[in-house]
Amino acid sequence: MNRFLSNATNRIDAKGRVSVPAAFRSVLTERNIQELYCFQDFVFPAISVGGLDLLDRFERQIAADDPFSPAANQMSLLIHGGGVFVRLDAEGRLMVTDFIRDFTGITNEVTFVGRADHFQLWQPEAFQALQAQAREERKLAGRRSE
């Protein structure tokens, strides 16, 4: 398994750390990801987390564009200005910093959400609400196509 799949909610400890789900840690190990690149998602109130390959993908998009274009500058603001590197501790925990809390609204628990090549950190109720909304919209889209 080399994809981040499913979701899990874990409690933040008294020191502000949260355990990354074992299934996600095994993907990180399998993909030899030791330093995590985190950025504020472009659409959702979530922090997207992946390896350097995730950052590289965005930087290739910027390089393919005119570096002085508004689109390239906006992308750089989002992925560089809205990104940080973090590491897991020896027990597989992630420090839930103000960078994460302020953008997501996370307080006591974190929902980890698999997104195939990366995962996201969500405030649990926000994830549940947006997942239910997405499910309902897909259901309605299916009815319209009949």
UniProtKB/Swiss-Prot annotation:
GO-annotated molecular function: DNA-binding transcription factor activity; transcription cis-regulatory region binding
NCBIfam families the record matches: PRK00326.2-4 (NF001477)
GO cellular component terms, semicolon-separated: cytoplasm; nucleoid
Broad class of where this protein is predominantly found: cytoplasm
Localization in the cell: Cytoplasm, Nucleoid
Residue spans crossing the bilayer: none
Tree of life domain: Bacteria
Span of domain SpoVT-AbrB: 7-54, 83-126
Family: Belongs to the MraZ family.
Protein known as: Transcriptional regulator MraZ
Classification via PANTHER family: TRANSCRIPTIONAL REGULATOR MRAZ (PTHR34701:SF1)
Keyword Transcription: yes
Self-association state and partner proteins as the record states: Forms oligomers.
UniProt keyword annotations, A-Z: Cytoplasm, DNA-binding, Repeat, Transcription, Transcription regulation
GO aspect biological process, one term: negative regulation of DNA-templated transcription initiation
